């Protein structure tokens, strides 16, 4: 779709500007103007934007705003003010209204009219419907105005407020730089030497993920700590900083010092547990077990006992000590009914019985978990394995109703397909429904003037393939009206039309639709032509690619994970570079990985490589896509079973186990919805 937009803009850029004289199509003029504007050619854009202001062009407020920005950037502040006043008077409902207010303040700041700028920004910030990005920039500009008014302390405090409220805002880095300039300019006002001021700044830097700068301050605070309590405080903060940055080698000695020197503190059990976790992740299981036992024995009332019991059980299981593992898992289940690891412990306990061939105990434990977690993570999973355990015990007739219950529970469950296979194995079969054919969409409902204002603009922008702007208009409708009924269905379709699949999915979940019709919005054929092309090149199932992308990025080309995975198939740059070299092409930049063609080329090749590595075993290939080949290679050694269903259930990483199931579920639904050959 980005390619289509680029073609459209290239087409309009190629036309002679005489084609957009007065009386010409304002839509074409706007498209060409926008192409110039976003390509850094404001002079060429100006006249074209002006030509769209004659008549009732639906995007006139956009043209007025862009003209105001161009005038501001040219230093023509009076003309910029005129355009902004025009926008706010003619289009009070415009998406650009708050941005226009910001630009008004910038005009005043540019002319050093700090009092006027401050008043504009103060009024903007008290608006109830102010957008988060606008609020952050307004606070930053208000701090600048205070500085200009000769109030550096107040400016500094406003920068602190911005950093405290929005540590991940794009304005936060600017605020840090501005504060550094203020400290340099006014050293007498900002000595920056008190314990409290240094600690607050270190905490802010840590929240902003400025690990290196935070480390320097925490070390300074630690070295200058006047008493044991203060020293413990900063040992804890510094160790937490290292752990959040995955710098475990630096964290270890600090955690050991906390556990050794402050055994009576509340931080001691945390330190012991985290040391155990580090060792556990390094597969130094014997030493890790000692630390978990220390938590259990020395700090039985701490908040880390349940997790330490669970970790100890896992290690006992790794060493083949079934009885010790079962006892530890059972302790978690009985002693910590509200623990986050309680259900996982009962799941692992049931599997201990299953693997040992103790089917009555396995059946009872799975059954108890199914009842306990009826609507939770393990509900259907435990119910299915309750039936499998009973079937292995010879109860073939009593399990059929359970399999039927699972198979009729809707395609949202990974276990529906497993239950259908089980019924076929037991001599029964259930016909799957034919592919769904949607009914014609209803016409638009009657809408208010405010909704119509944004809806007409969204549709105009969609025609020009300016989908992010169209989605922003639809977001205004969603935020201002809390739509219901037919309006919600309309919004769902418009989001879908503009490739905002996450938003259309969210609205579809709240819209009264049949399951099959809802699934069309929840499981879109996004990027279908490109995916079909890549699937043919790699000999891959196109529905598997769709299923994986839906789980990885929900078809958001600009998706970026906390682990720096990028684009549709969430590739990390080292993997992308490795696959690119394999294909004989240049390693892509991060920006290139946001392009659908590049991302799909590399991502589908990586998926193909994994399938080849694991003998076309989808479950293992998907597990490796999520957790890495090294992890799956280790699990192949540790999980001794030929039953692939069992292999999936015994994947130690909860996230990876769920990921494999969800991708396979997605694939099944895609096949049901769209595959004419099934």
Model-found features: residue ranges?
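Sec-dependent N-terminal signal peptides
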Residues: 6-14
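Acidic, polar-rich low-complexity tracts and alpha-helical solenoid repeat scaffolds
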Residues: 1-2, 12, 19-569, 573, ...
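Short, flexible loop segments at boundaries between secondary-structure elements
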Residues: 656
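Short loop-to-helix capping motifs
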Residues: 616-617
């Amino acid at each position: 779709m980005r390619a289509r937009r680029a073609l459209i803009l290239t087409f309009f850029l190629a036309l002679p500007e005489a084609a957009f004289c007065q009386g010409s199509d304002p839509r074409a003029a706007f498209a060409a103007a926008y192409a110039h504007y976003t390509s850094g050619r404001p002079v060429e854009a100006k006249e074209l934007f002006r030509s769209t202001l004659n008549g009732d062009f639906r995007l006139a407020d956009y043209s007025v705003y862009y003209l105001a920005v161009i005038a501001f950037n040219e230093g023509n502040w009076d003309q910029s003010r005129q355009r902004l006043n025009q926008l706010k008077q003619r289009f009070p409902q415009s998406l650009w209204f708050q941005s226009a207010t910001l630009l008004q303040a910038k005009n005043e700041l540019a002319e050093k009219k700090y009092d006027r700028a401050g008043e504009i920004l103060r009024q903007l910030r008290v608006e109830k419907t102010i957008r988060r990005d606008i609020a952050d920039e307004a606070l930053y500009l208000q701090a600048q105005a205070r500085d200009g008014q000769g109030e550096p302390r107040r400016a500094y405090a406003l920068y602190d407020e911005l950093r405290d409220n929005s540590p991940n805002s794009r304005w936060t880095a600017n605020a840090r730089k501005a504060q550094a300039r203020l400290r340099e300019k006014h050293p007498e006002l900002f000595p920056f030497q008190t314990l409290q001021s240094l600690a607050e700044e270190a905490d802010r830097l840590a929240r902003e993920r400025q690990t290196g700068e935070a480390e320097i301050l925490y070390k300074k605070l630690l070295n200058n700590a006047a008493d044991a309590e203060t020293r413990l405080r900063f040992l804890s903060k510094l160790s937490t900083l290292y752990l959040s940055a995955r710098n475990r080698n630096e964290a270890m000695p600090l955690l050991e010092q906390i556990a050794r020197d402050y055994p009576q503190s509340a931080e001691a059990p945390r330190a012991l547990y985290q040391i155990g976790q580090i060792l556990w992740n390094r597969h130094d299981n014997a030493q890790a077990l000692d630390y978990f036992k220390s938590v259990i024995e020395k700090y039985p009332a701490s908040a880390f006992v349940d997790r330490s019991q669970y970790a100890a059980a896992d290690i006992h299981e790794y060493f083949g000590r079934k009885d010790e593992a079962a006892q530890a898992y059972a302790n978690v289940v009985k002693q910590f009914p509200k623990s986050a690891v309680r259900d996982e412990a009962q799941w692992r306990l049931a599997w201990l019985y299953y693997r040992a061939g103790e089917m009555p105990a396995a059946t009872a434990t799975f059954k108890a978990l199914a009842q306990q977690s009826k609507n939770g993570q393990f509900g259907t999973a435990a119910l299915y394995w309750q039936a499998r355990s009973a079937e292995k015990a010879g109860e073939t007739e009593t399990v059929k109703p359970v399999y039927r219950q699972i198979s009729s529970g809707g395609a949202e469950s990974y276990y529906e397909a497993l239950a259908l296979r089980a019924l076929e194995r037991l001599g029964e079969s259930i016909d799957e429904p034919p592919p769904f054919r949607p009914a014609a969409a209803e016409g638009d409902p009657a809408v208010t003037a405010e909704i119509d204002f944004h809806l007409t603009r969204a549709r105009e922008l969609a025609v020009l393939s300016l989908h992010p702007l169209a989605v922003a208009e639809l977001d205004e409708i969603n935020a201002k009206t809390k739509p219901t009924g037919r309006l919600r269905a309309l919004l769902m379709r418009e989001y879908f039309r503009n490739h905002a699949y996450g938003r259309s999915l969210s609205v579809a979940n709240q819209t009264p639709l049949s399951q099959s019709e809802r699934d069309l919005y929840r499981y879109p054929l996004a990027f279908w032509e490109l995916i079909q092309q890549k699937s043919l090149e790699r000999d891959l199932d196109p529905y598997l690619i769709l299923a994986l992308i839906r789980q990885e990025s929900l078809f958001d080309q600009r998706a970026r994970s906390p682990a720096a995975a990028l684009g549709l198939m969430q590739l990390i740059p080292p993997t992308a570079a490795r696959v690119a070299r394999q294909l004989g092409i240049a390693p892509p930049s991060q920006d290139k990985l946001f392009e659908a063609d590049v991302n799909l080329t590399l991502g589908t090749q990586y998926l193909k490589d994994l399938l080849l590595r694991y003998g076309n075993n989808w479950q293992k290939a998907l597990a490796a896509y999520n957790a890495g080949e090294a992890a799956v290679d280790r699990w192949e050694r540790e999980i001794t079973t030929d039953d692939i269903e069992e292999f999936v259930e015994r994947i130690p990483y909860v996230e990876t186990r769920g990921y494999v199931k969800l991708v396979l579920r997605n694939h099944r639904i895609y096949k049901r919805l769209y595959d004419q050959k099934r």
